[in-house]
Amino acid sequence: MKQPATMKWSASISFLLLLNFAEPRVLHTNEFGIESTLDSSQCPTEKNMFNVATIVVAQFVQDATKAEVNKMSSDALAAMKENTGDGCLENQLSVFLDEICHETELSNKYGFSGCCNQSGVERHQCLLARKKTAPDSVPPFHFPETAESCPAYEENRAMSINTFIYDVSKRNPFLYAPTILYLAAQYDKAVPACCKADNMEECFQTKRASMAKELREGSMLNEHVCAVIRKFGSRNLQAVLIIKLSQKFPKANITEIRKLALDVAHIHEQCCHGNAMECLQDGESVMTHMCSQQEILSSKTAECCKLPTIELGYCIIHAENGDKPEGLTLNPSEFLGDRNFAQFSSEEKLLFMASFLHEYSRNHPNLPVSVILKTAKSYQEILEKCSQSETPSKCQDNMEEELQKHIQESQALAKQSCNLYQKLGPYYLQNLFLIGYTRKAPQLTSAELIDLTGKMVSIASTCCQLSEEKRSACGEGLADIYIGHLCLRHEANPVNSGINHCCSSSYSNRRLCITSFLRDETYVPPPFSEDKFIFHKDLCQAQGRALQTMKQELLINLVKQKPEMTEEQHAAVTADFSGLLEKCCKDQDQEACFAKEGPKLISKTREALGV
């Protein structure tokens, strides 16, 4: 079954588009001494070095011009070669940061001299903290126009592609380097094909739309993963990866899964730290390892492993989950056996829970990550409690029922959301979400609330197309990303204590916490302002989405004035507003009609709502 596009990118949360470099230099182990598969001592190839350097510099110095980025990139590569003779350094990123800070004129010009006055980890963290998605100083990204693309590409293909990489990187500072190079490869295919097409403009339009979607979704996903790592740490990331890898490769044993989880976690961390070279090098190594271990991992990646490196990672990520081994079952109440959980050391408990995550995940390939994390937490709590009981086996009698509660809650939410989507349609479902989220976070602007709830509706439109068994994982995966971005918004500009609690307490419980958080009880509505409820004839000219947005802004302002507004009151106000539109838009002097009838509607609404 072909997955919808949005389903695909939500599934990618635990992987990368890993491609385009030779094998890495560093052998690393985790806290239990589990060895990495990243054990080669080879150095990076020359292939794409300048493009990768462009990514690093443009993402750290987003305001820099193309010429400035070119100079810093060239100087950094020259320094690497001068220091080693072959460009192979243990810490390549530090060379780039040295070069960025060496340009004192630029550090003063773009306001990061304070970071450059620091050293080591502090300097790195300071520069990372300056990264901003869509900063005001950088205009929005637009794919090159048709008239520009063909002559520029024909004149200098390499420069055309590098300019594309620069433009994407500076506007998407959290987008992983492999993803940027993958998009650049798509651009490299699209331009010559469209320049020769009979309908050039239509060809470019189609290609641009597809690439823009991948760019937008990839950037959001990568920023989300980096924020989760920063907030909840490496151990949380490894737990997520054990789940996803166990679902994808159910034949693999726990030792192989732990190694892969360690390596993929390391890659995510390097990508998030802006270390594009190691991100790429280690990425290819992991994909190469996966292809060499198909017998113990999955045969579903066989066709992927025939592809060029540039396409290999994308293909493996989106390949179907492997087939479950015959006879694979799990009885949680018997998994511990006759061992005493209370006598385990902290390290033994972590390893045991990793094994449980592995077994539970490969037995439940369609469950959401968050549900499995919550199930594992409940399982551990039951083991802790029952290990203190005089009759441990009897204490565990209701274990299966307790663990099922998390699955049932998620599936019930998916069913309820899909039923509402089918009953109300996207516009009225969004209005329902708008009322709910305005009550939760009235401090958000109308534009932010409309954007967030629009994304929530897109979850239903995407996931409700799937079979029932896949809806929950699809919905929870996308909700995790969108709620994650609400938490990023809170991090940048605090919303309220309720949102803070949900964003800070538990990664696996964020969605449920936000769902259960009904209203910000600390919110005090502002004094009523008629300026927010002035109507003009432009309402009559507005059509489609523009008219819907105007109505939704009115709805948001009403809820901010009266958070406890009932459904009946909302329906009455909506009917009155529709009546105003119908009356005044038919009037010969529309503006005069709105000036006369608008205040009457406002007075009636204020009286009905008691504001």
UniProtKB/Swiss-Prot annotation:
Gene Ontology terms, MF aspect: metal ion binding
Q: Which residues are glycosylated?
A: 117, 253
Q: What is the stated purpose of this protein? A: Binds estrogens, fatty acids and metals.
State the family named in the UniProt similarity comment for this chain: Belongs to the ALB/AFP/VDB family.
Signal sequence residues? 1-24
Q: Which residues bind Cu cation?
A: 28
Q: Which cysteines are joined by disulfide bonds?
A: 101-116, 115-126, 150-195, 194-203, 226-272, 271-279, 291-305, 304-315, 386-395, 418-464, 463-474, 487-503, 502-513, 540-585, 584-593
Give the top-rank taxon of the lineage listed in the UniProt record for this protein.
Answer: Eukaryota
Protein name from the UniProt record: Alpha-fetoprotein
In terms of CDD domains, this protein maps to: ALBUMIN (cd00015)
Which keywords, in A-to-Z order, does the entry hold? Copper, Cytoplasm, Disulfide bond, Glycoprotein, Metal-binding, Phosphoprotein, Repeat, Secreted, Signal, Sulfation
Q: Indicate whether Cytoplasm appears among the record's keywords.
A: yes
Q: In which tissues is it expressed?
A: Plasma.
Q: What are its GO biological-process terms? A: animal organ regeneration; apoptotic process; cellular response to retinoic acid; homeostasis of number of cells; immune response; liver development; liver regeneration; ovulation from ovarian follicle
What range(s) does the Albumin domain occupy?
Answer: 25-212, 213-404, 405-603
Q: Does the keyword rRNA processing apply?
A: no
What Pfam families does the record point to?
A: Serum_albumin (PF00273)
Q: Which residues carry this modification: Phosphoserine?
A: 113, 119, 346, 446
Free-text description of this protein's post-translational modifications in UniProt: Sulfated.
Q: Which organism is it from?
A: Rattus norvegicus
Gene Ontology cellular component list: cytoplasm; extracellular space
